[in-house]
Amino acid sequence: MGFTYKDSGVDIDAADLSVQMIKRYARQTHIDGVLGDIGNFGAFFQLDGSLRQPVLVSGADGVGTKLKVAFMMDKHDTVGIDCVAMCVNDILVHGARPLFFLDYIAVGKLIPEKISQIVKGIAEGCTQAGCALIGGETAQMPDMYKEEEYDLAGFAVGVVEREKLLDGSKIKQRDAVIGLASSGLHSNGFSLVRKVLLGKMKVDEYISDLKKTLGEELLTPTKIYVRTVLDVLNDKIHGMAHITGGGLLENLPRILPEGLEFRIDKNSWEVPVIFKIIQRLGKIDSKEMYRTFNMGIGFVMVVERDEVENLLRKLNELGQNAWVIGDIVPGEKGVII
């Protein structure tokens, strides 16, 4: 008997079983507008007819080397939340409400139970963001990845009325900068984290300062800000930023008009313990920390000064810790910390 596709490392039966598992989780995320089910060649979504000038906003991202920690712990049910968060928080910056999400999973060996755990996390992330998981791709690539490893990326599409689209152009001098607390490291800087921490500690080591194991801290899912931010969004909010790779120093200038810069007071919030541990053990310069990690601020809103008290009150009522962390001053499209 000749070779089969399975002999080369690609198991179609396992793929079929995975699709059936994925359908169950995907259906749990369905919202108005979803047409059809997982398994078609394309996925369908019908826009709300009440939108006057809808603008679609899209974003794509991955989880990066945070996945290495998931491999080490053999825990795969939270990285999907990270994947959704990285995408929906990006499009949220522009005032967009996420509508639907698609995932891409590339594996060395397809194990349906592992895929099921990954997609369970993706579905949970979609539920938190109020969007639907409507499709994706699971690619078996036996010579590209080790059998126990995979890569994970996603694609989010949202909608905003054209007149409500935020791009930072309304930001002006004396606007206040509100920082929303992160849940931890989120999904950035893990190559440095692994170099600094995992050479000295084990993922199952209990860290008294963290009150949990190192692995539990590192795998804490990225916070999804969608429902909170959409609840408080109004015309006095002039710009927003998702603090991802590059930290405050690299992400904040992306939304600034010419002739302005951010002035950030790093003493206005308490930097979480995990960042202090990384900085101490790695002997990392403060500037490097602020251009690599979120340092406890996962999302930023730039608002009119007379809106600060009202916005902070609303965020607090929604259970979101937030602080005034700076203001907008004349400058060269940079960040002063």
Curated annotation (Swiss-Prot):
Predominant place of localization: cytoplasm
UniProt signal peptide: none
Keyword hit for Zinc: no
E.C. numbers: 6.3.3.1
Superkingdom of this protein's organism: Bacteria
UniProt GO BP: 'de novo' IMP biosynthetic process; adenine biosynthetic process
EC category name: ligase
Record-linked InterPro entries: PurM-like_C_dom, PurM-like_C_sf, PurM-like_N, PurM-like_N_sf, PurM_cligase
Any one of the GO CC terms: cytosol
UniProt keyword terms in alphabetical order: ATP-binding, Cytoplasm, Ligase, Nucleotide-binding, Purine biosynthesis
Subcellular location: Cytoplasm
Pathway given in the UniProt record: Purine metabolism; IMP biosynthesis via de novo pathway; 5-amino-1-(5-phospho-D-ribosyl)imidazole from N(2)-formyl-N(1)-(5-phospho-D-ribosyl)glycinamide: step 2/2
Sequence intervals crossing the membrane: none
CDD domains: PurM
GO molecular function: ATP binding; phosphoribosylamine-glycine ligase activity; phosphoribosylformylglycinamidine cyclo-ligase activity
Catalytic activity field: 2-formamido-N(1)-(5-O-phospho-beta-D-ribosyl)acetamidine + ATP = 5-amino-1-(5-phospho-beta-D-ribosyl)imidazole + ADP + phosphate + H(+)
Membership in a protein family: Belongs to the AIR synthase family.
UniProt-listed NCBIfam families: purM
Protein name listed in UniProt: Phosphoribosylformylglycinamidine cyclo-ligase
